[in-house]
Amino acid sequence: MGDLPGLVRLSIALRIQPNDGPVFYKVDGQRFGQNRTIKLLTGSSYKVEVKIKPTTLQVENISIGGVVVPLELKSKEPDGDRIVYTGTYDTEGVAPTKSGERQPIQITMPFTDIGTFETMWQVKFYNYHKRDHCQWGSPFSVIEYECKPNETRSLMWVNKESFL
């Protein structure tokens, strides 16, 4: 096992397919478990792009609400600062969220040698008939995380989460 990095920076981007369209979130205040709700459309595919620093880290998949998304190594960024993985998250068969409710979904990414990244997203899934609701709110390009691996190499503590 290699040295344990002091900090891990990772970003997760979601883009609705086939047109690489933006994903939106809305600020709900304290009405629900979290103050931000990510809006997703059922029966759709989303391109997932994960960028990681340091570039020595390896990951094979991300689990989004129990759906395992295999990640493929795409590249290192031109400046060599971060490594980039991509995959496709499919919401086919996901039930729409009931009106006035939100769904907490667990996000996990097991890293080789340093432990698992875990967080929760608050999501509302809309069906095709309410697809316009998916575009109300603020678009985001990426969710950035600053994490610290723990000494047992089992989990990473999330120090900071930012919607950009």
From Swiss-Prot:
GO terms for molecular function: type 1 cannabinoid receptor binding. GO terms for cellular component: plasma membrane. It comes from the Eukaryota. Pfam families: CNRIP1. InterPro entries: CNRIP1. Suppresses cannabinoid receptor CNR1-mediated tonic inhibition of voltage-gated calcium channels. Belongs to the CNRIP family. Interacts with the cannabinoid receptor CNR1 (via C-terminus). Does not interact with cannabinoid receptor CNR2. PANTHER family: CB1 CANNABINOID RECEPTOR-INTERACTING PROTEIN 1. This is CB1 cannabinoid receptor-interacting protein 1. It comes from Bos taurus.
